[in-house]
Amino acid sequence: MFAQVIQGRTKDPAAMWNRSEDWDRTLKPGAEGFLGSTAGVSDDGEVVVVARFESEEAARKNSDRPEQGAWWAETEKLFEGDVAFYDSSDVEISWGGGSDEAGFVQIMQGRAQNEEMRARWKEAEAEAEEWMRENRPDVMGALAIWQGTNFTNVMYFTSEEEARKGEQQQPPEESGESGQDDWMEQVEDLKFIDIKKPYFSSP
């Protein structure tokens, strides 16, 4: 799998939503290798789009289409300031990788201090999986996109209300979930982006 992350700011979330719908109608049918996307705007205007493709080649072919270039030229006008692009084939899927039925998406971004710290995260996540499945029915899946030790983690929830309730639970140490909490305390430049009205696109 290959993932593209597009990130910036806008003052017009409704127009951004319309551009996503336009892409679905006019460009998705010709996007070979497209696996799906998650997009949205936070309450303070931060835009995040996560698009998934079968391969880097498929993503490049999509980007090189003239109609894709024309669509982006119009969409780019809705952003304020610079737009950041992150591409990666280093993608990890957890708990099924998410769902288009999610009512709330939370994006966590940051930087692990080193590769060893990244490995510890993977171990803690594996240890926590059983507890999460049994005690956090609000979690519908997750996707982690890595660029070296920089990461974008996309978590899918049934709803924001259920996600907040789930956050209040105190898992036992042996579950592995507490290890994830300890890990996050060491992450550099940690930030959370809440997408309360996610837009999903599927092939």
Predicted regions span which residues?
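Short S/T/G/P-rich N-terminal loop/turn motif that feeds into the first structured element of a domain
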Residues: 1-48, 52-203
